[in-house]
Amino acid sequence: MILGIGTDLCDIRRIESSLERFGDRFTHRVFTDGERGKCDRRAARGPSYARRFAAKEACAKALGTGMSQGVFWRDMEVVNLPSGQPTLNLTGGAREHLARMVPAGHEARLHLTLTDEPPLAQAFVIIEAVPITATS
């Protein structure tokens, strides 16, 4: 069952401006060490940071909290599965809120898609609850 859906559209130029104006103060406030490492290795840092920013906003919307109720930027980390597919790793308040959303006998699955077409970056997040099945 679908528990939450969120989307966000982010202007890459706005993120590039924040990178220029605030530098590490901005990136350390919003992004995890892993995200900063991945983005900083890219020639075009702005779009990479903007996609992740959009993912965090979309996730907060899917959680139904926005950036409040104990959910902070760095509680949501964009990571990649071995296949390369992006997903989200939640910690802190985001993880706690997600746990409260999931009905008994179910587990959460987060689905994330990212794209950019300058000057915009976009993210969609779906939070799904699936029944826990016993393994034999």
Curated annotation (Swiss-Prot):
One of its GO terms (molecular function) is magnesium ion binding. Its cofactor is Mg(2+). GO terms for biological process: fatty acid biosynthetic process. It is found in: Cytoplasm. Mg(2+) binds at residues 8, 57. Gene3D superfamilies: 4'-phosphopantetheinyl transferase domain. Its EC number is 2.7.8.7. The keyword Cytoplasm applies. It catalyses: apo-[ACP] + CoA = holo-[ACP] + adenosine 3',5'-bisphosphate + H(+). GO terms for cellular component: cytoplasm. Keywords: Cytoplasm, Fatty acid biosynthesis, Fatty acid metabolism, Lipid biosynthesis, Lipid metabolism, Magnesium, Metal-binding, Transferase. Transfers the 4'-phosphopantetheine moiety from coenzyme A to a Ser of acyl-carrier-protein. Belongs to the P-Pant transferase superfamily. AcpS family. NCBIfam families: acpS, pantethn_trn. This is Holo-[acyl-carrier-protein] synthase. The gene is acpS.
